[in-house]
Amino acid sequence: MYTGIILAGGKSSRMGEDKSLINSNVNRLAKEMELHGCTRIIVMCGTLERADLFELECVIDSAESLGESIFELVSKIEGRIQLAPCDAYLADSELFERIDGVPVDDKGIRQPLMANFDSKEMVTKSTKISEVFELFPTCDGGLKARNTNTPEEFREIQCFLKQEDL
């Protein structure tokens, strides 16, 4: 089985609005994951109250930290996993196709929340995302691997969204 997990449970405090609802990106990412070959899509929605925001299968965070919640969810799944944060507005099936491990974006930032891996490879349980994915190989993700945390970053991403070929 090939499972896509969309991370959409954050508070989006720096953005000032819920990033998971901008541009219907959770649904868009789900479609891109399906195009890539994911047969099951799960949204890690954070809390029970947020589950109604999404039309897809939702899972509530099971631990205090995202790292531990991801670890616990992945431990219940067999096969390949493709992660994607809800603020990956440029990610598409072409990007997912070339990810093997943890991609590095065009700014040189490692993006562990966009990792692609076999569930058996997740062996480190930690509260820190960087530690959970530290043993995973790094691969090139380029511009499409960027995530967005502030209104300024989103404006920059919007410029790229207006272009046809990334």
Predicted segment positions?
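Conserved alpha/beta core of the MobA/IspD/sugar-nucleotide pyrophosphorylase nucleotidyltransferase superfamily
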Residues: T124-L166
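Conserved nucleotide-sugar donor-binding
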Residues: I109-K125, P151
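Nucleotide and nucleotide-moiety/phosphate-recognizing core
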Residues: M1-R110, E131-K144, F154
